[in-house]
Each structure stands twice: as structure tokens, then as C-alpha cells.
Regions:
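A short linear hydrophobic-aromatic micro-motif
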Residues: 49, 113, 231-236, 343-350, ...
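Conserved glycine-rich FAD pyrophosphate-binding loop
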Residues: 55, 62-69, 75, 119, ...
Length: 435
């Protein structure tokens, strides 16, 4: 059998490499960059397909190919390589858990300005490879805004360095952008250098509820806020379905997060109170309450490493990401609620009025879920946006096209893949168009 054969090859080829087998699958746990390089080189020469893992929280993104020959897990390739406190930069191994990194940096009053899903389990390599970001993307930006250098192990075993370890290091093409968000289809990120920010002095969360359901009020308020001098780090709209679960409020709600020195936060709170529509209900949440709220938000998306979610396949839970022009998020959230009210499905949705990114969770029967995916994707197209499926139960794999129409630049992506991974061994089917 291939599993037995590959297991024997790995133990002979790299006798000190940790190797495990389960469910007819070989998993290796490299602890050094050279081991990652040797494993990839061997797999490339022998055309063995590889799935790259960190904490496993994003293992469900894209459509993982279940016939990969080997899983390369970076959970034991961890640690801080270099932290320059004065320059506010840190270089870290890709398998380091995101929350572990933040706890270390907090000792120096610094942090990485990102808010990925499942921060307790996600690894920094997975966050960067998936370009993961959350509702605070409005103020924080994305991984592309935080990364200043990457070391990547190519499929043929070569180790390439792009960017550097200081903030001002750009000369020529910014190769970092090529790997951020590539879902491990071009190589394995081994080390990442990030620029840091100081830990915020004060944090506040304002919840605006709209019992009347008048989303034009929401839109008008958002325009006023975005046109003002205020700098919220999030402006996230939640439909009644998810508001009921997170806030015990079965109405449209708007979550505004503020982070700055305390005087600035209090000043912005006062301005928002003055701009607040008369029909809206305003609640200012304590700092600890704000942290607990966002923690719940970050764990609403499916966790690819959660066995309970895998076992609950019968629920047909599907996650979608929809991207539109920022204020069109109001229309997407409204449409999601209409679909939930009018069909035998439950649709929970939230989106950033400053970013245009919506996250949608759909539950129901197989037929209703498929129909809802199609409706939302088509609706996004009418807004010149897109809709992709982030998580899909195996029973729907043959029914739903997770990527939708290939973008006009798809030939460029395919050409890059062919050049960097000609044997197509890296994370098959994990990127646009099944790359």
C-alpha cells in the first residue's frame, strides 16, 4: 500500500523525522527548516502530493484533496527567531500559535495588528498563508499590511527569502505579496517577519441596535461616521440571526470598535452618541465585555480541526465569504436575512461597512443550502462582487462549485503555479480554480 511504502521511505530517508500514520494517512512533523526542505524535495522528485498544516483551523478552506500522499504539519516548528523591540519587528517560525505570539509580545507592550479566526489554535503561518483577517480589518488592515519578510521553502526544496527584517526594505518586486493568501500552493512558509504596533491603551465597543429594521438608517449613519475624523477599527453589521446568538438581540446591530489612548476613545464615544440615529439603541460595552464579544465572533466560523464539526456533517453547515463595495454590505446582509426568513434555512451573516467583506453561515437541508449559495453568489454578482465558499461538508463536495467563475486573471495564477510547482504537489485544489 502507498501509506506503508511512504512511511518506510520517510523513516529511511529522514530517520530523525517524527512520522505518524492514522486513517491510512502519513503525517510528518518537521522541527527544522532543513527537514521541511528535505521532505518537499523528496516529495517533488517522487511526485508525492503534500498537504501543509499548522493548527488545522483552516484545513477546510478551499477544497482539500483527500488523496494527498503526505501531510506536512508545522505544529512542532515553533518559536521566536528574532524580536527587535526598538524597531518593532518580530521574526517567528510558521508553526507558532498566533495567541502564543501575542502573549509573548504583550510582555514588551507590543502586538501584531491582526484579528484572525480561532486565534487560540491558528498558527501564524496559517494566518499569513490564508491572508486571514476579521472585523477589525478596517483599522488593522490585512496580513499584507503587516508582513515585511518571508522565508519560503519551494516545492523543489530551495529556500527563498523575500522582503527583509526591517520596515523599509522594498527594492524591486514585493515577492511577499505572492505568498500571502496563496494557501500553501506555492511553497511552505517557514519564517515570517512582521511589523508590530504598541498595545492599545484603551478599548471600547459600541453596539447600535436597530429595532425598526431600517437599514437605510444604518447606511446613512455609516457614511457620516466614515466621512468624519473618527477612526474606528471595526464597523461591523450583524443580521438578526447572528445578533440573537452573540448579543441576545434579534435585530440588526452595528458593532463599532475603538482603540486608542483613553481620552481619544472617550471623545469618539461622545461623537458617536451625537451621530446616533434617534431610532437606534446605543450600548457602550465594557473593555472586558468587548474582548469577550470579539472572542465569540472569532469562533463563529468553522474550525477545520474541530472533530465535532466534522461529525455534524448532517447539519450541512456552509460558510461563505462575499466581497462587495463597502457600503453594499448593507444590501448583502439584508439579502441574507430575507433568504433566512423566506426559506427553510438559517443564515447568519455579518460584514464590514468599511471593508466590504461579509462572512455568511448557512444551515439547512442539502437542497436548500445549495440553492441559498447560488442565490447569494448571483446577488453578489449584481453588485459587481464575488462569493466563494470557505467551508463545505464533504456530502456537498460534488454539488457546489466553491470558487464560482474563474477570474479574468486566472491564466496568470495558473502560469505562476506551473512555474513554481510544475509537478503540482503543493496543497492541491486549495486555491482559485482548483490550483
Amino acid at each position: 500500500m502507498v501509506t506503508t511504502e511512504l512511511l518506510g521511505e520517510m523513516k529511511t530517508f529522514l530517520p530523525n523525522l517524527k512520522v505518524e500514520t492514522s486513517d491510512q494517512q502519513v503525517t510528518v512533523y518537521p522541527q527544522t527548516e532543513s527537514e521541511i526542505s528535505e521532505v518537499l524535495k523528496y516529495c517533488n522528485e517522487n511526485k508525492r502530493k503534500v498537504q501543509v498544516l499548522g493548527g488545522g483551523t483552516k484545513s477546510s478552506l478551499g477544497f482539500p484533496n483527500e488523496t494527498v500522499d503526505l501531510k506536512l504539519c508545522l505544529s512542532e516548528y515553533t518559536g521566536i527567531v528574532e524580536h527587535t523591540v526598538g524597531d518593532m519587528t518580530v521574526t517567528v517560525k510558521a508553526g507558532t500559535r498566533y495567541e502564543e505570539l501575542q502573549e509573548y509580545l504583550a510582555q514588551h507592550n507590543q502586538r501584531v495588528a491582526l484579528d484572525p479566526s480561532w486565534p487560540e489554535h491558528a498558527t501564524i503561518g496559517g494566518v499569513i498563508a490564508a491572508n486571514d483577517s476579521g472585523p477589525k480589518r478596517l483599522g488593522y488592515g490585512t496580513a499584507r499590511d503587516s508582513v515585511i519578510g518571508i522565508r519560503t521553502v519551494y516545492p523543489d526544496g530551495r529556500i527563498i527569502r523575500s522582503g527583509g527584517r526591517v520596515v523599509k526594505n522594498v527594492a524591486g518586486y514585493d515577492m511577499n505579496k505572492l505568498f500571502i493568501g496563496s494557501m500553501g500552493t506555492l511553497g511552505v512558509l517557514s519564517e515570517i517577519t512582521l511589523k508590530l504596533r504598541p498595545v492599545q491603551k484603551s478599548e471600547s465597543l459600541l453596539i447600535l441596535s436597530f429595532p425598526s429594521g431600517n437599514l437605510e438608517e444604518v447606511r446613512s449613519f455609516a457614511i457620516k461616521l466614515l466621512d468624519s475624523m473618527m477612526e474606528p477599527v471595526s464597523l461591523e453589521l450583524f443580521n438578526p440571526g447572528i445578533s440573537a446568538r452573540l448579543l441576545d438581540k434579534n435585530v440588526y446591530t452595528l458593532a463599532i470598535s475603538l482603540e486608542d489612548v483613553e481620552s481619544s476613545v472617550r471623545y469618539q464615544e461622545e461623537l458617536i452618541q451625537k451621530l446616533c440615529p434617534t431610532e437606534a439603541e446605543l450600548e457602550i460595552v465594557s473593555e472586558e465585555g468587548a474582548k469577550q464579544f470579539w472572542k465569540k465572533v472569532y469562533t463563529t466560523l468553522p474550525n477545520g480541526n474541530d472533530s465535532k464539526q466534522k461529525d455534524a456533517d448532517s447539519e450541512k453547515a456552509v460558510s461563505m465569504k462575499i466581497g462587495v463595495v463597502n457600503l453594499d454590505v448593507v444590501k448583502v446582509i439584508r439579502e441574507s436575512q430575507l433568504l433566512s426568513d423566506g426559506q427553510a434555512v438559517t443564515v447568519e451573516a455579518h460584514g464590514g461597512l468599511g471593508t466590504g467583506i461579509c462572512q455568511v453561515m448557512i444551515r439547512g437541508s442539502k437542497e436548500d443550502v445549495v440553492q441559498t449559495i447560488t442565490r447569494l453568489r448571483e446577488y453578489a454578482k449584481t453588485l459587481n462582487g464575488y462569493g466563494i465558499v470557505r467551508y463545505l461538508p464533504g456530502s456537498l463536495a460534488e454539488t457546489v462549485d466553491i470558487w464560482g467563475d474563474k477570474p479574468s486573471y486566472y491564466p496568470l495564477l495558473e502560469g505562476i503555479k506551473a512555474k513554481m510547482d510544475p509537478n503540482r504537489i503543493m496543497n492541491p485544489n486549495r486555491f482559485v480554480g482548483g490550483i
